[in-house]
């Protein structure tokens, strides 16, 4: 097997030709950890840690979160070529604007992620799905937020009554995939989880057609 070819550039930069070997490495050594703040959704900690390659400990302010599930709900009953994607419109105070998003929600303490995804889809949209597939998972903003986002593909949809929480004001749409992609290209969809899930799904569809 041919070895990975690497060429060192300026300031230790490595230019990889071929496959990049993914090396997660070891976690930093936590010297101290103090909880600074807590609300129902998350907890804030100030940690003093010794990171690999560093001579002195550093301070890291981080948010601990149970993690979230993201649901890409797809209805291809009317069109296999251009299926409908469930999209929500809701106001996000942190962003100070209305955003168009796929359904998502927090995982409760001790809750299985698939069970959480099924619960959130029903609560927010009323839809139930016959087929569930794990697409990917990623960190939302790992510089300070320890939140995993688990993305599920939900297919074989059946409509029902939504059961949103009291503070959730949602408008629910079913939008053709081609239109969602057009809005992404135009910069009109600005929600990260929606960008990740829709663009990954579109890529997998293209790959499946080629295969």
Predicted regions and their residues:
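Nudix hydrolase/Nudix homology domain
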Residues: 2-28, 98, 109, 134, ...
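Conserved Nudix-box catalytic region and its N-terminal flanking loop in Nudix hydrolases
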Residues: 13, 20, 25, 60-65, ...
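Acidic, metal-coordinating catalytic segment for phosphate/diphosphate chemistry
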Residues: 32-72, 76
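Acidic pyrophosphate-coordinating catalytic loop
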Residues: 35-40, 93, 138-148, 206
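Short beta-strand micro-motifs in enzyme catalytic cores
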Residues: 43-47, 98, 148-150, 171
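Short loop segments at secondary-structure junctions
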Residues: 52-54, 75-79, 91, 154-159, ...
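Unchanged
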Residues: 58, 69-70, 106-192
């Amino acid at each position: 097997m041919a070895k990975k070819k690497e060429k060192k550039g300026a300031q230790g930069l490595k230019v990889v030709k071929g496959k990049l070997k993914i090396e997660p490495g070891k976690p930093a050594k936590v010297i101290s950890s103090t909880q600074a703040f807590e609300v129902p959704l998350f907890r804030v900690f100030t940690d003093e840690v010794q990171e690999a390659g560093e001579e002195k400990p550093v301070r890291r302010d981080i948010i601990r979160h149970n993690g979230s599930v993201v649901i890409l709900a797809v209805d291809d009953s009317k069109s296999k070529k251009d299926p409908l994607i469930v999209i929500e419109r809701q106001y996000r105070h942190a962003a100070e604007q209305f955003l168009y998003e796929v359904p998502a929600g927090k995982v409760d303490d001790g809750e299985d992620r698939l069970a959480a995804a099924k619960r959130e889809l029903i609560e927010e949209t009323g839809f139930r799905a016959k087929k569930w597939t794990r697409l990917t998972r990623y960190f939302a903003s790992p510089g300070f937020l320890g939140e995993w986002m688990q993305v599920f593909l939900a297919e074989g949809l059946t409509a029902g009554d939504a059961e949103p929480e009291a503070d959730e004001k949602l408008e629910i749409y079913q939008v053709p995939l081609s239109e969602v992609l057009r809005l992404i290209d135009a910069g009109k969809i600005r929600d990260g989880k929606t960008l990740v899930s829709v663009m990954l799904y579109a890529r997998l569809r293209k790959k499946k057609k080629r295969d």
